[in-house]
Amino acid sequence: MTRVYNFSAGPAVLPEEVLQQAKDELRDWHGSGMSVMEMSHRGKEFIAIAEKAEADLRELLGIPADYKVLFLQGGASAQFAMVPMNLLRGKKSADYVNTGEWSKKAIKEAKKFAGVNVAATAEATNFSTVPPQQEWKLDPGAAYVHYTPNETIGGVEFSFVPETGGVPLVVDMSSTILSRPTDVSKFGVIYAGAQKNIGPAGLTIVIVREELMGQALPGTPSMFDYKVHADAASMYNTPPTYAWYVAGLVFEWLKNKGGLKSMAEINQRKSAKLYAFIDSSGGFYKNPVEKHSRSWMNVPFTLKDAALDEPFLKGAKGAGLIQLKGHRSVGGMRASIYNAMPESGIDALIAYMRDFMSKNG
């Protein structure tokens, strides 16, 4: 069977090397006679897997010692609630920046727990750009500032880390984590669903500064309290062990690729190549995002005539290029090109797009 190029926004493509290692170890992990899926999460075998995964993630991101790394469940959607439940700490409001669909979801959930000050929004530009920070209206008394550095649906990405004047900065890094170097010390909380750049669905990584834990809202369920999970080394309940294991393999793969600086160079090159082709197509293909706000990870584009969408997708599938249909809320196409998408996948996509244009232009 020939592998396809999978441009899914998530669950997304995994590195070939990781899939092969997982296959090789599936029935017998390191001579244990067990699959990782069968291991007790409190047994020494899985503890070794868990500890190495955390150590490798800390090394890749340069996570300071005063931050806890939590391996949780529930995706970013659960974090939309966990963030205000844990970080309000006696305050009544928080600042949010609205740059698209995932920002909106976070804002909607936060309103159940606190007053939300939308400090900036990209609605006026139909979410085609990131509002410059000089236009933001931050509240110095806010409990925290929340933003989404990359909107996977709209393909809008921040090119800067916001300055918050000492107010804790919270970031939904689900689609950009590990795609480039990150100064973790600038953030109070980083959270990320795993199914884009980390591993399989079912795992959520949360990186939280220790001083921000331990003041959850009264009545917060134990499963939603960061400190409960930190004190239990992410094993307050049975964690998603296999997803944690595969994430660890991805961390090893990233280290072997040269780390996040090397990954950033590859990702920038991949996205630049695809945008350059779209921009040179004479309007046959269009990307709606302002150039300075274009995403490295998610490239949405439309064809000159929506009637060509279905033939385009059918032909792409025949060429081994799948999951290119845009999100239902915006239509068109979307190529998600996370870390594990090889550059050859971009080349194959461009070749197909060029051929389709020549036949339908």
Enumerate the predicted regions with their spans:
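PLP-dependent enzyme catalytic core of the Aspartate aminotransferase-like
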Residues: T2-V4, G318, H327, G331-G361
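Conserved PLP-binding catalytic core of the aspartate aminotransferase-like
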Residues: Y285-A316
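Active-site C-terminal subdomain of aminotransferase-like
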Residues: P15, A194-Y275, E290, K359-G361
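PLP-dependent aminotransferase-like
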Residues: S77-V145
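Conserved N-terminal alpha-helix of the aminotransferase class I/II PLP-enzyme fold
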Residues: G33-Q79, N86, E101, E109
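Conserved active-site segment immediately N-terminal to the catalytic lysine
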Residues: V170, V184-Q195
